[in-house]
């Protein structure tokens, strides 16, 4: 059985611990080791996680039978637009519907904040197998782009969206 709870600053260590497994596993065949290191520091250093929470990112941690199995982050972008910043599942929990559980949790969170119709968007690397997952969850490709992230690196992403 899956459960989820909203994360607090005290959970930054747990989020980072899961990210150190899930993020490299997701991108090991897509990004260079140098870009992986750069992005891990940029996204998951303790100070950057605390900053994200202070800026309004809301993290949820998912559990399967009491064991942490993944996390998500949602951020309001505009009155009727929310960004699914992150959704990652530890490799050993992939294929057991943890991702769809967290995806639905993101929608539930947004609907609590914004009962009127709105849109959820996300960026996903064009070569990430998660593109198919997001399509199965009802998202569609809105546009694509190559976004400079510093350090000479780019994110080569689809921007996908879902009306909720």
Where are these regions (language model features)?
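Extreme N-terminal starter segment of soluble prokaryotic enzymes
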Residues: 1-3
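Acetyl-CoA-dependent GNAT
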Residues: 6-12, 17-92, 103-113, 141-147, ...
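Conserved glycine-rich acetyl-CoA-binding loop
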Residues: 67, 90-104, 117, 125-132, ...
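C-terminal "cap" of GNAT-fold acetyltransferases
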Residues: 116-131, 135-164
